[in-house]
Curated annotation (Swiss-Prot):
The keyword Nucleotide-binding does not apply. It catalyses: 2-(N(omega)-L-arginino)succinate = fumarate + L-arginine. One of its GO terms (biological process) is L-arginine biosynthetic process. Its main location: cytoplasm. Keywords: Amino-acid biosynthesis, Arginine biosynthesis, Cytoplasm, Lyase. This is Argininosuccinate lyase. GO terms for cellular component: cytosol. Belongs to the lyase 1 family. Argininosuccinate lyase subfamily. InterPro entries: Arg_succ_lyase_C, Argininosuccinate_lyase, Fumarase/histidase_N, Fumarate_lyase_CS, Fumarate_lyase_fam, Fumarate_lyase_N, L-Aspartase-like. GO terms for molecular function: argininosuccinate lyase activity. It comes from Chlorobaculum tepidum (strain ATCC 49652 / DSM 12025 / NBRC 103806 / TLS). HAMAP family: Arg_succ_lyase (MF_00006). It is an enzyme of class 4 (lyase).
Length: 463
């Protein structure tokens, strides 16, 4: 039988005739998770108490007492002097109980006109805002590192790939600027989300509002929100913002995972395009020669974890009637895990990329000898007024011939080229150089050195 002795009184317990079962309390306790919200909870409570005092719902002296007490509780939590235990049920209870011990019965006035429903919704939005800003700064740092890499390698020729097959020569700077664009969209998504998250739900109470003369706009102002809720039911029952945040983080992790895949492949002996600093690689416990791209592999693996968090949240919310339901307590583990996983992945991956370098000599040798210049032959023929489909067919036959003869495209003689089409002349050899191929691209946003330099300049100007 569960032991009910020495159980702390819970904030909602007065209506019940017997104590809450201890096993049920332990099962439902969230303090081990939502303890992370103590700063946000105290921040929201200080704003609420200040507003209560200004509105005359409590005296200004009482409001001052509460604010001073809350700041003391925050210091105790930060110093480790106050350690929550599962019997406290949640972080809101921990803080209010300790506040009562410090300032006495006045602590009971803090919750005037407030429910844990709008309280936790406020805490969550404050947490989202802080982590949106945190991850946004990490994305800016990532973009800055990618700009440096693009600048460093803007005149380095490498392969561009489709289907993981060598496709066409490109500027390596163009490759790094592609990632810069992707992480830029991630930052835009978060900035857009921040606008929706920065609306205060405080004052919605349980879900129907309050009969007390609250001033939700003042609470919002104190918490630096941009506005207040327009529907009290929506204010406490909505978790769209949490789902949207985890979705945005899933996109970030997807980009990191794809980038990781390139790092893993390119640093392998089979590719040997990229070298990773020893500071960001690991070895084997049995094979002394190994140098593994473990950081990239871990980032790739953690992506699945964040995807799982997104499905977790969608599944929690899909069948809930309005307004608040206790199921929604379970949004915190996937939210917190996603924020920490995304932030740590961005931080360590950026530092790893900073300490990588391209093997330029190998790339120069491989691109000069490869069949990836075939598209240049097709476009050369198009410029000679041959329809593209015919040019493509002719070029395909030339590629097959080169493979059969063991030749590279630049080493095929003009007489050999002319057996495929009379349109060929000496000018074909000007196009069969990797740098000429890259710099012949004329479209905006292409891989030419000029275009890449323009991309870099625009990105620097936008910082």
């Amino acid at each position: 039988m569960s032991d009910q002795s020495n159980q702390k009184e819970l904030l909602w317990q007065s209506r019940f005739s017997e104590p809450f079962d201890r096993e049920a309390l332990k099962f439902s306790s969230s303090v081990h998770v939502d303890g992370l919200l103590y700063r946000e909870d105290i921040q929201g409570s200080i704003a609420h108490a200040t507003m209560l005092g200004e509105q005359g719902i409590i005296s200004k002296e009482e409001a001052g007492q509460i604010v001073t007490g809350l700041k003391a509780v925050e210091k105790e939590i930060e110093s480790g002097e106050l350690t929550p235990v599962w019997e406290d049920e949640d972080i809101h209870t921990v803080i209010e109980n300790r506040l009562k011990e410090l300032i006495g019965p006045t602590a009971g006035k803090l919750h005037s006109g407030r429910s844990r429903n709008d309280q936790v919704a406020t805490d969550t939005r404050l947490y989202l805002r802080r982590n949106i800003d945190r991850i946004g700064e990490l994305l800016k740092a990532m973009q800055s590192t990618l700009l440096d890499k693009a600048e460093q390698y803007k005149h380095t020729i490498m392969f561009g790939y489709t289907h993981l097959q060598r496709a066409q020569p490109i500027s390596a700077g163009h490759y790094y600027m592609a990632w810069h664009s992707m992480f830029g969209r991630d930052a835009q998504r978060l900035a857009d989300l921040r606008k929706r998250a920065n609306i205060s739900p405080l004052g919605a109470a349980a879900f129907a509002g309050s009969t007390l003369p609250l001033d939700p706009a003042r609470s919002a102002e104190l918490l630096e929100f941009d506005g207040v809720f327009t529907n009290s039911i929506d204010a406490v029952s909505d978790r769209d913002l949490v789902i949207e945040f985890v979705s945005a983080c899933s996109m970030i992790m997807m980009h990191l995972s794809r980038f990781s895949e390139d790092v893993i492949l390119w640093s392998s002996a089979e590719f040997n395009y990229l070298s990773i600093s020893d500071a960001f690689a690991t070895g084997s416990s049995i094979m002394p020669q190994k140098k593994n791209a473990d950081i990239a592999e871990l980032v790739r693996g953690k992506t699945g974890r964040v995807y799982g968090n997104l499905m977790n949240l969608l599944t929690i919310m899909k069948g809930l009637p309005l307004s608040y339901n206790r199921d929604m307590q379970e949004d915190k583990p996937p939210l917190f895990d996603t924020a920490e996983t995304t932030a740590s992945s961005l931080s360590v991956f950026r530092r790893m990329i900073e300490k990588t370098w391209l093997n330029e000599e190998r790339l120069a040798r491989l691109t000069a000898e490869d069949l990836s210049l075939a598209t240049e032959i097709a476009e050369y023929l198009v410029k000679k007024q041959i329809p593209f489909r015919d040019a493509h067919r002719i070029t395909g036959k030339i590629v097959a011939y080169a493979i059969e003869q063991g030749k590279t495209l630049p080493t095929i003689s003009l007489d050999e080229y002319r057996t495929f089409s009379e349109a060929f002349d000496e000018g074909i050899y000007d196009d069969l150089k990797p740098d000429a191929s890259v710099n012949s691209k004329k479209t905006a946003g292409s891989c030419s050195f000029k275009s890449v330099e323009e991309q870099i300049a625009r990105a620097k100007a936008a910082r």
